[in-house]
């Protein structure tokens, strides 16, 4: 949601944009200033006779006197608003303005009317008329009336009278807020007037009064245009208070402004719907069009925007007080219990609200207090963050909302967030072997990790040429888009012909700037030309072009993501490269946790003002060791681009087992249960290069694949933390543990076949988002396929290998798997194309306008994970892909094809077992579409890390990334 520019409304409420109410009087009366003065004095003389007849304290006369005074006053104020300086004295006041203060006209008339109103009926109507007259005078005056003391005195008298208890009415409230808004605009245009509206205390020891401010505060949480006008006007005063210590102290010490805002947020939150009507299976976050249709939520968001604007422009005293009140008066007592409701629907709603709030806030101080609440506040002995992490492993809907929340948190590029989620568990380097710690900073300059990730694409998901096979592999391998440059690795690097995460749901613009976008964007390999229609098999050249565009687009997007993360993390306090901060032998996590909670004076000031370029040293250290520096053990995979790959498969494990045994004996000597695992690892690694022969595949990729599978499928290590994301109470502190966040992500990732398609989109996007970070500890943990971890620590490569095996086993058990896979791709492409054609707004708006924090181009999840609100035409067109063909063969996932034992989608009236089996098959087929694209995305990210621009690792002349990055400690 875009931040509202509060100050830009100043001009729209200026006098020049208001339609004059007395337009029909301007031409005749302003022709002769002397005549205007004569008419003005005539009206005033008649008013004076009524005032003097009654006396200053006598009871006013009847309704005729009141009506006469009201009519004469209206005529005088109309003339006064049109008064101009005479040509002989252009800088002086006009004749009417010079006469009115001399007679104290406004104060005398107003005092008489107020006295009459106290004794009669209809006080609110007459008060509303007075407010309307003064608003007209202020808004339409052609001279600076507020610079004259008698005019300000009359206004203050009227504002003071508005504080007396009178029956409220919509007209009275509207007139008061409109007058106050006009006064705020005038004061913003002439800041020196603010001190004149600050009245001295009526008695010694009392607080001063700023009626211009105090009369607006009660309306900040009102609905409709009335509350919006108040929220538009108050930031103008807040901006002026930043340069006025007197006004700043008055607002902070002698007004209820900050408590009203905080308690108002609490009251408005209590009126929000506790359950959200989910529009479709893909729903995972609240977008602007969603909450605009909910009046209670729209009012809350308007008030939250107002708090954000106040903190942005107010005096530092007001900023600090308001932030404290929001934390202690809204987040802790309201948001904390709301996030811990027992009902799943309420948990989904509160999590979605929190994600929306974090995405909408732009002021670092307010964002910091929200993060402090998440990271440090404890509810029932658990931090809010731990509770939210545990919910990733819950049901599909709550999992999706939680993943969306963590995606928003990672988009902030805040050091404390990533420290609490991942880095504090990786800093001690307990997850790697002792001999592997120097390799943490290594950079994969030769793309071996990319080769390894691409080699994990299941055979059933690769494109196979029809029988007899056509000699097209060599030409494909020589294509410029191939991830490998060696022709010997043609079969090692599979043909990633499935639609990419970006291409499945189409891009905002074509790949090259020279191409003009058509009415509906086209994904690679799915252009609008008849040659690429679904009914025609692509030629080898078209398939090669699809591959090149597919993987090249991943590389472009990965480069943008890595560069953005490098920029955003520059002001972090440490590079997290295994040396800084230095790991300590204390119990796991104690040092890093204390680091985040240190007072500001005891911690490196990396927030406003100082910019430490420590984050750049992580990548520089790895790259500086030279291209020949490779980690000795190559246990997790062998680069497929080596021509002598088979020999390396046999040689590397022998060296790696020695390193593995040495590291285990040094680091895990006191634990039992690892001896059997090491023996099995040694046997598996020593047999990694032999493999079994297969007539369908050349020996090299099969040997590599079996060597990998023998390593990635060891017996389950002791300890329950792989099955349960959270560390159990009896788990030893010294046992390697990568944290509950990574544990629950890996556990969810390993069950990709059971997840819904939308959960997998969000899950893989979150892992890719983590992989883009430049910190060597995190980069090596996720992307270094040669890193040797402790036996009890699962690597991402092991998890992906497990998913690959499950997909291949499922494909072997499903007779019509190739047809189902093709239909799933067609459905996803058709849906993305139609949704994109109906509306280009694919995801939430950027949180702020800074170019460094612009959201990525529409990805698979961002374009598919939209509400199911497509028009009927789009829905019917998408279903064409899913309907059975005329010949009885199913074209999509809505019905089974001939020979299929199980339809993908459940049929009406089917047994629960049949429906459950259909859902299982559907999720597995969609997983087979997503998994290869995820592997290509990881491969592209690993290559992007190796080619990160050197200037990004140095001090930038343009400044750092988002303001919240390295913003300092989150504790008060």
Swiss-Prot record:
The family this protein is said to belong to: Belongs to the FHIP family.
One GO CC annotation: FHF complex
Keyword Phosphoprotein: yes
UniProt biased composition (Gly residues): 618-627
Organism from which the protein derives: Pongo abelii (Sumatran orangutan)
Name recorded for this polypeptide: FHF complex subunit HOOK-interacting protein 1B
InterPro entries noted in UniProt: FHIP (IPR019384), FHIP_C (IPR045669), FHIP_KELAA_motif (IPR045668)
GO BP field: early endosome to late endosome transport; endosome organization; endosome to lysosome transport; lysosome organization; protein localization to perinuclear region of cytoplasm; protein transport
Alphabetized UniProt keyword annotations: Phosphoprotein, Protein transport, Transport
Region Disordered, residue ranges: 465-496, 510-547, 573-642, 710-733
Pfam families: DUF5917 (PF19314), KELAA (PF19311), RAI16-like (PF10257)
Complexes and interactors: Component of the FTS/Hook/FHIP complex (FHF complex), composed of AKTIP/FTS, FHIP1B, and one or more members of the Hook family of proteins HOOK1, HOOK2, and HOOK3. The FHF complex associates with the homotypic vesicular sorting complex (the HOPS complex).
The protein's role, per its UniProt record: Component of the FTS/Hook/FHIP complex (FHF complex). The FHF complex may function to promote vesicle trafficking and/or fusion via the homotypic vesicular protein sorting complex (the HOPS complex). FHF complex promotes the distribution of AP-4 complex to the perinuclear area of the cell.
Residue numbers of Phosphoserine PTMs: 467, 510, 523, 529, 533, 859, 897
Ranges of Low complexity composition bias in the record: 479-490, 523-535
């Amino acid at each position: 949601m875009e931040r509202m520019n509060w100050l830009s409304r100043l001009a729209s409420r200026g006098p020049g944009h208001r339609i004059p109410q007395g337009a029909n009087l301007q031409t005749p009366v302003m022709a002769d200033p002397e005549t205007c003065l004569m008419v003005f004095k005539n009206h005033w003389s008649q008013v004076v006779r009524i005032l003097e007849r009654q006396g200053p304290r006598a009871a006013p006369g009847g309704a005729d006197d009141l009506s006469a005074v009201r009519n004469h006053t209206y005529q005088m104020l109309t003339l006064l608003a049109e008064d101009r300086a005479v040509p002989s004295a252009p800088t002086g006041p006009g004749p009417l303005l010079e006469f009115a203060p001399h007679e104290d006209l406004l104060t005398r008339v107003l005092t008489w009317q107020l006295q009459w109103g106290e004794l009669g009926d209809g006080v609110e109507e007459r008060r509303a008329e007075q407010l309307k007259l003064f608003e007209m005078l202020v808004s339409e005056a052609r001279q600076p009336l507020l610079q004259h003391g008698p005019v300000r005195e009359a206004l203050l008298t009227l504002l003071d009278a508005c504080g007396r208890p009178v029956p409220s009415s919509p007209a009275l409230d509207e007139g008061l807020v409109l007058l106050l808004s006009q006064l705020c605009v005038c004061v913003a245009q002439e800041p020196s007037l603010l001190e004149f509206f600050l009245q001295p205390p009526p008695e010694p020891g009392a607080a001063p009064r700023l009626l211009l401010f105090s009369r607006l505060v009660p309306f900040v949480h009102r609905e409709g245009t009335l509350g919006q006008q108040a929220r538009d006007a108050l930031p103008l005063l807040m901006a002026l208070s930043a340069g006025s210590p007197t006004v700043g102290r008055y607002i902070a010490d002698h007004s209820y402004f900050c408590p009203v805002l905080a308690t108002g947020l609490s009251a408005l939150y209590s009126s929000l719907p506790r359950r959200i009507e989910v529009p479709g299976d893909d729903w995972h976050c609240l977008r602007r069009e969603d909450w605009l249709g909910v009046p209670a939520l729209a009012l809350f968001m308007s008030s939250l925007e107002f708090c954000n604007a106040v903190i942005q422009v107010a005096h530092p005293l007001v900023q600090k007080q308001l932030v404290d009140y929001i934390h202690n008066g809204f987040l802790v007592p309201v948001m904390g219990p709301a996030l811990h409701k027992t009902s799943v629907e309420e948990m989904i709603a509160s999590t979605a609200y929190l994600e929306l709030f974090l995405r909408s806030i732009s002021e670092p101080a307010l964002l910091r207090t929200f993060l402090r609440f998440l990271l440090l506040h404890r509810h029932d002995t658990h931090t809010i963050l731990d509770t939210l992490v545990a919910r990733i492993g819950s049901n599909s809907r709550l999992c999706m909302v939680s993943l969306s929340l963590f995606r928003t948190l990672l988009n902030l590029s805040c050091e404390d967030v990533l420290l609490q989620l991942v880095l504090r568990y990786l800093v001690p380097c307990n997850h790697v072997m002792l001999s592997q710690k120097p390799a943490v900073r290594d950079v994969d300059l030769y793309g071996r990790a990319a080769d390894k990730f691409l080699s994990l694409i299941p055979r059933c998901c690769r494109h196979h040429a029809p029988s007899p096979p056509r000699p097209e592999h060599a030409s494909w391998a020589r294509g410029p888009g191939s991830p490998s440059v060696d022709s010997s690795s043609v079969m090692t690097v599979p043909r990633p012909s499935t639609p990419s995460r970006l291409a499945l749901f189409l891009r905002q613009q074509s790949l090259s700037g020279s191409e003009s976008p058509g009415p509906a964007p086209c994904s690679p390999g799915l252009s609008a030309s008849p040659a690429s229609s679904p009914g025609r098999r692509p030629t080898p050249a078209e398939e090669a072009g699809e591959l090149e565009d597919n993987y090249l687009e991943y590389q472009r997007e990965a480069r943008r993501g890595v560069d953005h993360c490098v920029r955003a993390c520059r002001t972090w306090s440490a590079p997290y490269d295994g040396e800084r901060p230095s790991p300590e032998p204390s119990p796991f996590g104690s040092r890093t946790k204390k680091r985040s909670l240190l007072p500001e004076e005891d911690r490196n000031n990396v927030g406003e003002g100082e910019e430490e370029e420590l984050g750049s040293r992580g990548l520089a250290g790895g790259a500086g060791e030279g291209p020949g520096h490779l980690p000795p053990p190559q246990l997790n995979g062998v680069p497929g681009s080596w021509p002598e790959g088979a020999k390396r498969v046999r040689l590397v494990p022998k060296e790696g087992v020695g390193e593995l045994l040495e590291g285990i004996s040094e680091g895990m000597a006191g634990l039992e249960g690892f001896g059997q695992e090491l023996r099995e690892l040694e046997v598996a690694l020593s047999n990694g290069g032999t493999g079994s022969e297969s007539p369908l595949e050349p020996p090299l990729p099969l040997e590599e694949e079996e060597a990998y599978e023998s390593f990635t499928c060891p017996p389950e290590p002791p300890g329950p933390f792989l099955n349960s994301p959270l560390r159990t109470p009896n788990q030893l502190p010294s046992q390697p543990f990568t944290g509950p966040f990574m544990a629950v992500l890996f556990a969810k990732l390993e069950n990709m076949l059971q997840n819904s398609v939308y959960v997998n989109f969000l899950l893989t996007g979150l892992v890719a988002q983590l992989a883009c970070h430049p910190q060597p500890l995190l980069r090596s943990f996720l992307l270094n396929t040669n890193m040797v971890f402790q036996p009890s620590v699962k690597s991402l490569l092991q998890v992906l290998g497990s998913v690959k095996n499950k997909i291949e086993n499922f494909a072997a058990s499903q007779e019509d798997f190739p047809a189902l896979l093709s239909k799933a791709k067609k459905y996803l492409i058709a849906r993305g194309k139609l949704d994109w054609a109906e509306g280009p707004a694919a995801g939430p708006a950027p949180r702020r306008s800074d170019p460094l924090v612009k959201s990525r181009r529409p990805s698979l999840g961002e374009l598919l994970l939209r509400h199911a609100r497509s028009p009927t035409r789009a829905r019917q067109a998408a279903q064409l892909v899913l309907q059975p063909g005329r010949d009885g063969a199913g074209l999509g996932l809505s019905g089974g094809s001939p020979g299929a034992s199980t339809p993908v989608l459940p049929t009406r009236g089917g047994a629960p077992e049949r429906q459950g089996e259909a859902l299982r098959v559907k999720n597995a087929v969609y997983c087979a579409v997503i998994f290869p694209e995820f592997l290509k995305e990881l491969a592209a990210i690993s290559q992007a890390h190796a080619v990160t621009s050197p200037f990004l690792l140095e001090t930038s002349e343009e400044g750092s990334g988002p303001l919240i990055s390295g913003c300092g400690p989150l504790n008060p």
